[in-house]
From Swiss-Prot:
Biological process, per Gene Ontology: cell division; fibroblast proliferation; meiosis I; mitotic cell cycle phase transition; regulation of mitotic cell cycle; regulation of transcription by RNA polymerase II
Homology family: Belongs to the CKS family.
GO molecular function, one term: histone binding
Protein name: Cyclin-dependent kinases regulatory subunit 2
Source organism, top-level taxon: Eukaryota
Subunit structure: Forms a homohexamer that can probably bind six kinase subunits.
Stored Pfam families: CKS (PF01111)
Function: Binds to the catalytic subunit of the cyclin dependent kinases and is essential for their biological function.
Length: 79
């Protein structure tokens, strides 16, 4: 990964959600709030680009530059 680029993981799934993680360059990661999960407006302002429906659902304390996202699977794909 280039140090100035945002990296998007492949998507992975469980019975209810589709997941992906996004790795920010260290400089950008300094702008990630430590007190709350980001709204879509906040993560888009950082330059993260994804389709609609993704939610920042967890803060990974050891690596705050990695943003964890999920969105519900369509009903017909849920187990």
């Amino acid at each position: 990964m280039a140090h100035k680029q945002i990296y998007y993981s492949d998507k992975y799934f469980d019975e209810h959600y589709e997941y992906r993680h996004v790795m920010l360059p260290r400089e950008l990661s300094k702008q990630v709030p430590k007190t709350h999960l980001m709204s879509e407006e906040e993560w888009r302002r950082l330059g993260v680009q994804q389709s609609l429906g993704w939610v920042h659902y967890m803060i990974h304390e050891p690596e705050p530059h990695i943003l964890l996202f999920r969105r519900p699977l369509p009903k017909d794909q849920q187990k």
